[in-house]
Amino acid sequence: MYLNKHDYDLIVAGGGLAGLIVASSAAYYSNQTLRILVIDRNPLPILGRKTITGWICGDAVGKKSVDYMTERIGLKWGYPEIEHPVKGVIAYSPNHEAAISFDGEGYLLNRKMLPQKQLQDALKLGVEIRGNIALRSVLAENDTVVGVAGQDLITNEAFKKTSRLVIDATGVTSVLRTNLPIKSFIQTKIDRLDLEATGRYIYNFDKASEDKTYFDSRYCIIHLDQKIAPGGYAWVFPKGENKVNIGLGVQQKALDRHNANRGIRQDVKALIDNYVRSNPVISNPTIACEEMDDGNGWGTWQVSVRRQNDCLVANGFMMVGDSGWMPKPLDAGGIGPAIIAATIAGKDAVEAIEATDTTEKGLWKYNINYINEYGYKTAGLEVFRRMLQTLTNEDIDYGMKHFLSKMDIDSITNGQHPEFSSLDMMSMIIRGSFNRHLAESLRYTANMNKKLVEHYHDYPSDPQDFEKWHKVLLDYLAQAYSRFQ
């Protein structure tokens, strides 16, 4: 019915950050010879908006990720989509006595302005973009995705378009992935424990004092504190000298336990409001409502904090960004992984289309290319995150002071095998102040991280070997989950 005639070579579902990059990447690598359509539910002037409250995001991204895109497909960002540069990220212990810096230079983006820059970039590359279309499902034939179906929100008419390949960039709650009607290795549903509820304000404010552990215009600040953000962390990301993206993310299970222990019923907004009030630097906060922030000053969202989907392709189908559960498990940072994945996916999609092989096997190299570039480290970060969620504030204070050096954090975030300051461990044993349980948890996590990284570097080159590989992965993760319940 559909296979012999296609409206487009490539349809990208979702016109957010990842969707517009993958479309531009495909246009670049095909020398603009492919018919590419991007579809978004929003009107083009508010392209990529996540909910009616705006483009909810922490807004931070590492310079290396942006450079990765620019060096490969030539897309360049500047002001106003890049709103403020930072020198790195600093994580503080609950008592603020220990700090670890990591990640290097980066940017705070303006997520309302960025889609308009991306829109113009994509149009210049010959990409067609349709707004006001709500996609409900993929079209499938002979166990292959061959297009998309939905509704035109202006005319209320049915919308249906066919293509050689569909790339899903519709976000963590993707109905295309959840209701995928064909046989595949893609995991269609996410475990609730692998989701965090997040929220943030974008505030203009007056400075009441100077305290670099609460606000520093040069650095993104993370506060690890189970009382402030149960099972997650809180952040203060500068967007200028007197402007901030401030918020937090929590694990729902940890928040429920937090509330039960205190006999209260706090939601994410209440936690954030308390967090803002407790900040001694921020005075007279007002929601940013200038043109570049209007309609984007407050919002909540759900973010995945697990490894990327164990398989990112099926016959006629690929996933990028949040729909593939790509945010970093340790801090829910999703922009960097999305940029990298979308840049790679565009190239791999073009090669598959030009080879007239958009089967699962023809697209399989995208799994491998993404893992080799970024995804190899995410399962280890997922285990590290689960370990952190079992710690008390006292454990975190102690661990950050005695165990976790900058080298250890860099090793963890790069998927390497940290040593966890073994000399400090020896000196603490001599002093009799050794926290053996915490040390054993860190060592176990480091060893499991090493196994997982090695296993990901052995990702199968052929789909027929996936199930065997996947069983070993799930066995490793089950062991870790049982330890950190």
Predicted stretch roles:
Residues 3-38:
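N-terminal Rossmann-like FAD-binding beta1-loop-alpha1 element of flavoenzymes
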Residues 15, 25-28, 121-283, 325:
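Predominantly flavin-linked oxidoreductase catalytic cores and closely associated redox partners
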Residues 25, 29, 41-89:
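N-terminal FAD cofactor-binding segment of flavoenzymes
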Residues 57-64, 101-121, 201, 256-267:
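Short beta-strand to alpha-helix junction loop
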Residues 67-117:
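A conserved beta-strand/loop capping segment in the N-terminal third of enzymes
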Residues 135, 228-234, 250-256, 260-345, ...:
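FAD/FMN-dependent oxidoreductases across multiple families
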Residues 325, 347-398:
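Active-site-proximal substrate-binding core of FAD-dependent oxidoreductases
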Residues 387-485:
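C-terminal auxiliary extensions adjacent to catalytic cores
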